Amino acid sequence: MMTDLFSLKGRVALVTGGSRGIGKMIAAGFVSYGARVYIASRNAAVCEQTAAELSKLGGPCIALPVNTSTVEGAQSLASALMAREPRLDILVNNAGAAWLAEFDSFPEKGWDKVMDLNVKTPFFLTQALAPALRAAATPAKPSKVINIVSIDGISVNPQETYSYAASKAGLMHLTKRMALRLVEDNIVVSAIAPGAFKSEMNILARDHEQEVAARIPARRVGTDEDMAGAAIYLASRAGDYVVGSTLIVDGGVTYAR
């Protein structure tokens, strides 16, 4: 058993926002470790391209180009997945949005867009996929839900991303509340709080890597392997007893800023 602690062979996974950035890192890790992976993204062309790329890593990666920024979109994605798979072992709620604006001019739409995608969508997508998650779950092999939060929900980022910080702090607490309920159904809910990883959402880490790395105790930004490793841990047998917790993957930033 110890040799299979991190195996995902035979498992079915769905990663939202899986066509790029952190979602793509996680999806790549899952495929490499044997899972059948579905990735969702609103950009159909990019979603299909990423699925084809990741399929070359060894296991199938299937594109589901659906916009999950609304409750209806989340329900549509759930229907599309369940039309293809009778069960779902792993759900990664990764799709997210941010909004940067000064306090005096921060608009209501900057709250609505971010809270809808970052908090409401993870809840309602998990709710819609609950039948498939329950179908896969057993006491010996629970299904997994992994919410991607942020260190900005734990400590304060100097940038004025008010709704983003609030949404990620809220999703961390929602993770705990969902975890207590869903573990009754053999569904284990946890979260990952990434720090600086190169992506379109974190353009500072992408475009100014050395400058950002100098402010990180580990002296580097996160790599694809760092993120994939954290997600594989939580998704596999190794993470079965991690219920409601948030795994911080940030090179020490949270404790230094």
Tell where the protein language model's regions lie, with residue ranges.
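Short C-terminal tail/terminal secondary-structure segment
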Residues: 2-5, 155, 232, 243-257
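Conserved glycine-rich cofactor-binding loop
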Residues: 19-20, 43
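Substrate-binding pocket helix/loop in short-chain dehydrogenase/reductase
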Residues: 102-103, 107-115, 212
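Active-site helix of classical SDR
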Residues: 126, 167, 175
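Alpha-helical segment proximal to the catalytic Tyr-Lys
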Residues: 131, 180-181, 240
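Residue(s) in the substrate-gating loop at a strand-loop-helix junction
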Residues: 150
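Short, small/polar-rich loop/turn modules that mediate ligand/substrate recognition or access, typified
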Residues: 183, 188, 242-244
